[in-house]
Amino acid sequence: MDALLQLKGIDKAFPGVKALSGAALNVYPGRVMALMGENGAGKSTMMKVLTGIYTRDAGSLLWLGKETTFNGPKSSQEAGIGIIHQELNLIPQLTIAENIFLGREFVNRFGKIDWKKMYAEADQLLAKLNLRFKSDKLVGELSIGDQQMVEIAKVLSFESKVIIMDEPTDALTDTETESLFRVIRELKSQRRGIVYISHRMKEIFEICDDVTVFRDGQFIAEREVATLTEDSLIEMMVGRKLEDQYPHLDNAPGEIRLKVDNLCGPGVNDVSFVLRKGEILGISGLMGAGRTELMKVLYGAMPRTSGYVTLDGHEVVTRSPQDGLANGIVYISEDRKRDGLVLGMSVKENMSLTALDYFSRAGGSLKHKDEQQAVGDFIRLFNVKTPSMEQAIGLLSGGNQQKVAIARGLMTRPKVLILDEPTRGVDVGAKKEIYQLINQFKADGLSIILVSSEMPEVLGMSDRIIVMHEGHLSGEFTREQATQEVLMAAAVGKLNRVNQE
């Protein structure tokens, strides 16, 4: 079968990192191609090369059999390649039709918008997807699932032959997911090709025909989904045994350091758990399960409505992040660029930002020599690759930025270290270094909470694992009990703490 779209031998490098090396992707008419790989495998970079956001360093792109280069998202969109991003690009205050044809409104011979034609065309697009609502409805009145359908209708308005869906079900309910799958089957029957990017195994086996696997920026394989099992697919993605990739330190945890009882807050309902000295507690669950919210309520970044937290036997109340820090709880955010780092400031300034009390004299002036000494020590300990501590942190790679974010947390000498997605967007080499650092903290008696969407990471690094589902704790497992299947069952609510035995 001839591919609608072919990318072959794609290379793309950024300063200090090769994001793609010989990567390839084929998209066939009437078939769904899953694109899979761990975080940092190169999936997003490949999509940006495909849609013209990034220029490829080497390789070829064949569109409908012809060698092509797109010079930006507009040209790829007009050629017939549509992309539906994880974050929806719709304006809630406008109608569905206005969103679909934004910037391309139908104009009559008098130069005025032809509303009648625009709504009629939009209604036709919605009918193609078997949607029951009309295009004069405000987008803000729709559910997230229906908004996603509007994004698909918008893509179809460009006569798209290939549609890329990036984590399309992350914010959807089960019913909305089923509606999406019905639409995907409809698109297949119209001979459109679909690229489906997801980390959810169940969906890959339910809706996809083929799968392409990337690892460390390289093309690993293209296979028919029917010929694979979940285990063989994971093996292709990971490329090595779990224990080789995740160096687990087998130390017995100490006494209880943190005790959480019936904690409630925004997106968090009646959660209880304990954390011991020298223990890594993994927190697993799907997107929207409440993992990050739980950590922010614990740390003081979100309000606690009820429940108790005790640290080393003393009750602590955290009404703000400052309270969390003062009590020895450090939170390293999943979004280091928004919550964690000031990209225009230097490595030194970022690293010492929350620990300035330790480097301040009584009058408030800084002991610059002490600050430089401490920052230099952490740069060496963490093997941060930077020309100097005065380098702007925005110029460092993702892995080195993350090391600085973690080092900053440790400068305050915490008792509890919360790592939320610590290796997101970090290359494989830096991941291994971060895992080794985590083990070092564990050996020093630090209590660590590891929140991660990467199930192998949670399984490989944790001593114990708790699973969140819709704001509740849906399972707690020892390292020996935990498997991908068990964690996934708890994550989708099939297990609960009563029947998990």
Curated annotation (Swiss-Prot):
Keywords linked to the UniProt accession: ATP-binding, Cell inner membrane, Cell membrane, Membrane, Nucleotide-binding, Repeat, Sugar transport, Translocase, Transport
Record-listed ATP binding positions: 37-44
Catalytic activity: D-ribose(out) + ATP + H2O = D-ribose(in) + ADP + phosphate + H(+)
Gene3D superfamilies, per the entry: P-loop containing nucleotide triphosphate hydrolases (3.40.50.300)
Record membrane topology: Peripheral membrane protein
One Pfam family this sequence matches: ABC_tran
Gene Ontology cellular component annotations, sorted alphabetically: plasma membrane
EC number, as in UniProt: 7.5.2.7
Xref: CDD domains: ABC_Carb_Monos_I, ABC_Carb_Monos_II
Subcellular location, record wording: Cell inner membrane
Cysteines engaged in disulfide bonds, as pairs: none
GO molecular function, a single term: ATP hydrolysis activity
Residues of the signal peptide: none
Residue ranges occupied by any ABC transporter domain in the UniProt entry: 5-241, 252-495
InterPro entries cross-referenced by the UniProt entry: AAA+_ATPase (IPR003593), ABC_carbohydrate_import_ATPase (IPR050107), ABC_transporter-like_ATP-bd (IPR003439), ABC_transporter-like_CS (IPR017871), P-loop_NTPase (IPR027417)
Keyword Transport recorded: yes
Subunit structure and binding partners: The complex is composed of an ATP-binding protein (RbsA), two transmembrane proteins (RbsC) and a solute-binding protein (RbsB).
Family, similarity comment: Belongs to the ABC transporter superfamily. Ribose importer (TC 3.A.1.2.1) family.
Function noted in UniProt: Part of the ABC transporter complex RbsABC involved in ribose import. Responsible for energy coupling to the transport system.
Protein name per UniProt: Ribose import ATP-binding protein RbsA
Native source species: Salmonella paratyphi A (strain ATCC 9150 / SARB42)
